[in-house]
Amino acid sequence: MKIIYPAVFHKENNQYWVEFPDLEGCHTYGESLEETLFYAKEALELYAATLLENGEKLIPPTNISSIATDENSFATLIYGDIDNYLSSGKAVKKTLTIPEWVNQIGIEHNINFSQTLTDAILHQYMR
């Protein structure tokens, strides 16, 4: 299944981070623009595959021309193909322990813990 969603790239302190306005909690970062583009595609694919595997639906993407950016950001379209993720098996449940204060920050900022852990593992693996 091919998907295309708009993403907003932000530059801060010579690093980049990216968010998908239509996909709450779907974001990643990189040391360079090239690395961030790679991780953006991966984050989009993993996020979309996880939604579908959980029986949820993808919302239609926003028209990129309606996305506002500032001088340190830009919007672009990210293409993804989630067939490989969907055929690679179901998500597995993991039990882990994190400091209570980290958990509280995550809850307060609506951080998707599963997505964050997945992103972190893939980020370490790709290095």
Language model features by range: what are they?
Residues E24-E34:
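A short, exposed loop/beta-hairpin motif centered on an aromatic-Gly-Thr core
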Residues P21, E31, E108:
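Surface loops and adjacent helix of pleckstrin homology
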Residues S32-A49:
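A short, charged, amphipathic alpha-helix used as a generic interaction element across diverse proteins
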Residues K2-I4, E45-H109, Q115-H123, R127:
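Short, charged, surface-exposed hinge/linker loops at domain edges
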Residues P21-E24, P99:
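Short, proline-centered helix/strand-breaking motifs
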